Amino acid sequence: MVSEKMPYEYLNTPCVLLDLDLLDANIREMTDCASDAGVQLRPHTKVHQSAWVAKRQLEAGACGIEVGIIEQAEAMAHQGLHDIVVGHPFVGEHKLATLKRIASNPRNQVWLVADMVEHALGYAAVARGVGRELPVLLKIDTGGIRRYGVPPGEPAVKVATELTRIQGIHLAGVYGHEHGAENTEEGLSSKAFEDATILCDTARAIRSAGVAIDHVSVGASPTFRWTCRFIKEGKFPEITEIHPGNCVIGDIGYMMNGGNRRESCAVTVLTSVMSVSHDAYAVLDAGIKTFGADSLIATRDAPNFFWEGMPSYGSVQGRSDLWLGRLNAEGSCIYYRGSGGRLSLGERLEIVPNNATLVINIHEKLYGVRGGIVEQMIDVTGRGVGS
């Protein structure tokens, strides 16, 4: 039986650890950066999916939270989180029914994102049905991710104008999400500046067309520090809110994108050695069902991406000579590639995953640890919700 205040070396493996000292430090960095710039912080919760973590972020000064999908918003609202941006536009009977349940509670302030008039028509029908007006943010495609978003400039002005004619919603502002920056200081600063410029220019164009909007929301983990710096320097007074997410948790993928440092990654997988019968590798009890299967293949041109033809699926704490090169459903092979010594049967390793979002979404609980002790068992509120 697992209990709080027990040394985490006694936990059954595999399991997921959340280093609370690193979590708190990452929350402070995000909050201080936004506060110093004089901009509101609304952290995206898509990685940790935890109401417990989100409440710590609010206690530190965040103005609210962001989720990706409407089902996650309902899960968070049930846990007492009431000011929520839903980052992805949506349509459909089931999703609109979920919105109706959320909007029927007057305590809930849900902000919706649209990039088509059709999205807003569905939201507005719900709003009229519950007798309240709902705020909508117009998603702008600033380049990079190429997913949701109306093109900036005149196309955005056209959609914004049409949204003002729909009874039941009000156009609150514009929303953008940076993606695709090169992981260099120049690349990150350039992308932050470019996207902020596109969004602010579009906001000014919408206002010049006679449409009053209050909010300009930007942000992503790799670029948020640069965005805050530019806001502090007075370059983008239109920006009211930033919404980075992953940097509060961190993983190898975001480290490679400039979103966090290796030493600030707060989540690790605790795993045990199940076999040392081979000279070249040991077998662990954590596989695809624990790590997911993200090899970060999009970064395959990076130096040392492959070793012996294998990508890595995570980074072992304190053992850079080990290579997590092969995953199966319920186990993995970790290879020796240096002189660090062979692993022992039953030995435990902590591994920073490539993709913390996948790892956390697989598990029902995280074990919050501090100083080697389990301090908090943390429910993954959004696990399996809407996915």
Regions found by a protein language model. Give the residues of each.
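Generic N-terminal amphipathic, Lys/Arg-enriched alpha-helix
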Residues: M1-L18
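Active-site-proximal beta-alpha core segment in soluble small-molecule metabolic enzymes
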Residues: H44-N183
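Conserved, mostly hydrophobic/aromatic
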Residues: L23, K46, M76, L138, ...
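N-terminal glycine-rich anion-binding loops that anchor highly charged ligand groups
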Residues: V2-S3, L22-V53, E66
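Active-site loop/helix belt of alpha/beta enzymes
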Residues: T142-G259
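Active-site loop ensemble at the mouth of alpha/beta enzyme cores that anchors a bound cofactor
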Residues: T223-G309
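C-terminal accessory subdomain/extension
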Residues: A280, L284-S387
